[in-house]
């Protein structure tokens, strides 16, 4: 039961960690259930919040509605109450197109028994990729022998992962027809600042990861590939590691430096209001920019010709501290429950740390120890996946009615720092 429950939580939280082999343990009906759970989980907590409101006569109060508007972006470029329909429509469109492309790229030598199996494989992996689910219907996933050299499929899957990690607000801002027409007529108009910051940060992190991955793995996992193939492999891992969990290499065979790089990237995650986990790219960017501003002696945090409100900077710090603190506590608990793994000659603490960050960041990468973990360890990972998927929005939402404001403040006094 614990393995089935673990899988259902992993699918709903679009993580991808699995205590059993999805391709052999579950029938096609079971795999269909996993696919639907990934689809529902990928719609994002905000969409479910509005769906709950539609089904609840009481609906949302002004405070809750304001919080959701604030989470998406203040001065949003679309009405938040139209968000649900837009998210459904866009996600289905992308998944159908992605599934069709994967289907067309399947070659006759691939071991599918029927056309139905090809269609199911295509749809499953399209949904898994776009929703950053990390599950696969074939043994070994994207690292299966018949998929290792299917580089065009790798590119399609990576593109789906990237779109999912960009997030719905970014996609709406960049590709809504009315906004595109408006920008063509008025060239001075540009995408929302949050969109520009998120996309730039995301692409920079991908570029840095690709370069460092190539350096670390050139004579290791990339040893039997040419430059183009190696670049595609590095790009796939650089995109997937931020939350998708699909891999085209054996994670356990990676160099320690690459594992550490992946830990950092999983911790950062994808964009806000996306299918990705982690602290989010905007949080990471604000923390870096704030640090730079402090070093330069600036009083304000400035980005792209705009001053960032102090509240947003404080929120980013809060996300970093709570996310990092929760992850460290859960990692410590795993060292207490998984002593049998630490006692293995080919395993170490970094395997547990990698597994925990993968769960907390809803990434789904594993060095192969998920199935070895005790029921207590799996319980810790289940908790981590739940918390990582819900994130700060749900916590704020739960306590929204209890938020109090005061009309006074205490005198300031400086303390020693550093």
Annotate each PLM feature.
Residues 1-418:
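Membrane-proximal intracellular helices of multi-pass ion channels
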């Amino acid at each position: 039961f614990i393995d089935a429950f673990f899988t259902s939580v992993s699918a709903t939280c679009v993580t991808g960690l699995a205590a059993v082999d999805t391709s052999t343990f579950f029938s096609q009906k079971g795999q269909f259930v996993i696919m639907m759970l990934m689809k529902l989980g990928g719609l994002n907590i905000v969409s479910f919040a509005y769906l709950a409101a539609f089904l609840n006569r009481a609906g949302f109060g002004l405070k809750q509605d304001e919080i959701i508007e604030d989470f998406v972006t203040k001065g949003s470029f679309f009405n938040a109450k139209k968000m649900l329909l837009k998210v459904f429509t866009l996600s289905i469109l992308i998944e159908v197109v992605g599934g069709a492309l994967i289907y067309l790229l399947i070659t006759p030598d691939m071991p599918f028994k029927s056309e139905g199996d090809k269609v199911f494989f295509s749809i499953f992996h399209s949904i898994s990729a776009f929703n950053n689910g990390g599950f696969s219907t074939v043994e070994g996933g994207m690292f299966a022998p018949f998929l290792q050299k299917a580089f065009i499929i790798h590119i399609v899957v990576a593109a789906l992962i990237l779109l999912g990690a960009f997030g719905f607000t970014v996609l709406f801002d960049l590709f809504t027809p009315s906004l595109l027409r408006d920008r063509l007529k008025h060239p001075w108009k540009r995408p929302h600042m949050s969109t520009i910051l998120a996309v730039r940060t995301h692409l920079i992190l991908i570029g840095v990861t690709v370069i460092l991955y190539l350096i670390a793995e050139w004579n290791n996992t990339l040893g039997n590939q040419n430059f183009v193939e190696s670049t595609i492999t590095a790009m796939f891992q650089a995109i997937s590691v931020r939350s998708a969990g699909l891999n085209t290499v054996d994670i356990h065979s990676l160099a320690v430096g690459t594992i550490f790089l992946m830990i950092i990237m999983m911790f950062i995650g994808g964009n806000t209001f996306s299918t990705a986990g982690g602290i989010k790219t905007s949080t990471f960017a604000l923390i870096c920019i704030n640090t730079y501003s402090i070093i330069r002696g600036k009083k304000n945090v400035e980005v792209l010709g705009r001053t960032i409100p102090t509240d947003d900077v404080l929120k980013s710090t809060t996300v970093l501290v709570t996310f990092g603190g929760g992850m460290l506590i859960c990692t410590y608990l795993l060292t207490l429950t998984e002593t049998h793994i630490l006692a293995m000659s080919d395993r170490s603490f970094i395997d547990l740390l990698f597994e925990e960050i993968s769960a907390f960041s809803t990434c789904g990468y594993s060095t192969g120890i998920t199935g070895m973990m005790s029921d207590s360890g799996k319980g810790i990972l289940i908790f981590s996946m739940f918390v990582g998927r819900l994130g700060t929005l749900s916590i704020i939402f739960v306590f929204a009615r209890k938020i109090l404001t005061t009309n006074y403040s205490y005198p300031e006094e400086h303390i020693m720092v550093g």
